[in-house]
Structure formats: C-alpha cells, structure tokens
A protein has these predicted regions:
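Extended alpha-helical segments
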Residues: 1-30
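Extended alpha-helical scaffolding regions
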Residues: 28-124
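Context-gated lysine
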Residues: 7, 11, 24, 57-58, ...
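Detector for methionine-enriched segments
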Residues: 1, 23, 45, 49, ...
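Charge-dense, extended regions
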Residues: 108-176
Length: 176
C-alpha cells in the first residue's frame, strides 16, 4: 500500500527528472518485500540498507529511562520551594533542578540514537524534544541504577506525581 502511494506521488510531481529511477526503486522494494527477497535490498541499496538493528533490550531500557526522567522532571517542576529544598538537601547537587542530559555521544551512541529516534521521529517523550541528548560522559549505568529503583515506585504512580522522598530515593541511586 505504501509503495502504491509513493508511485502515485512520483507520477503526480511536476519535476519528472528522477521519476524513472524512483519508480524502479519503489518497484524493487515492493517486489523484494512481496517475494521475501529481503537479501536483495542491501545489495541494491548499499548504505541505506545495513545489518544494524537496535537491540530490543536497549530500546526497552531507553523507554524506561525516558519514562523515569519524565516523572522526575514533571514532579520537580510542580514541587513547592520547600519540597525542592528537601530534594536538594537529601541528594546534594544532583537534587538541584534534576534534568535528563542524555547518553554519552562517544560510547553510548546506540542508546542516544534510540532516544533521539523515539523523541524526534516517533514523537514520544516530547518533554525532551529539541534537547541535545548528549551527556558528554557515561550515563547508562547511572540511569539503569536509577531506573531499577524507579520501577518499584512507578507502579504506584497511577494518578499522582512522585513525592520528594521518592525522588530522593531514585536520585540517590545514581551514585550507588
């Protein structure tokens, strides 16, 4: 169905210079998919088709981390001054305006790429849209420790935000 839409768009365009090549490409993709000839796509479309597939466990981890940070940032934004002070006192500098800074762009690129795709392409976790998402330092291990602690709290957050004590518990696990 998508290939038929693409064919119609190519035919309707005023500029037909590349139409023949584009139609050939659409037909190739369509025939490869319909015929089960997936091997043909990387042969013909070098650079577009590749062997990389995101690890589903890493996708799940990134979703859990983004979900956790959504709760942290949203709750903190609604805390009173006294509650914010309580978090900062309980955690130290990590408790002062806690924000998700992403993943290390040099060593955690798959995690960063998954996060960017979720936010920018799929429109998920829109609170992070427009952010760099490159922490410039290793972050996965810290986020995973926090997410592990958060999972026990998460199931009780139906219809309510995190409390200062819950946030302190999660943020403290960043250093554990």
């Amino acid at each position: 169905m998508l290939s038929e839409i693409l064919k119609n768009q190519i035919k309707e365009r005023a500029d037909q210079r590349d139409a023949e090549y584009e139609m050939k490409t659409v037909n190739l993709v369509q025939e490869a998919i319909y015929g089960g000839h997936f091997w043909a796509l990387p042969w013909e479309m070098t650079g577009v088709m590749h062997d990389h597939v995101d690890d589903p466990k890493k996708v799940r981890a990134v979703v859990d981390i983004l979900d956790m940070w959504t709760f942290i940032e949203r709750a903190y934004a609604r805390f009173s001054s006294a509650e914010k002070a309580e978090v900062e006192t309980g955690v130290g500098i990590l408790g002062k305006n806690p924000k998700f800074h992403g993943f290390d762009g040099n060593n955690e690129t798959e995690y960063m790429g998954i996060a960017r795709f979720l936010v920018e392409q799929l429109g998920r976790f829109q609170d992070f849209k427009g952010r760099d998402l490159n922490s410039h330092s290793p972050a996965v291990a810290r986020h995973m420790r926090m997410a592990s602690r958060f999972q026990n709290i998460r199931r009780n957050l139906i219809g309510r935000e995190m409390s200062p004590s819950e946030m302190i518990s999660v943020l403290k696990s960043e250093r554990d």
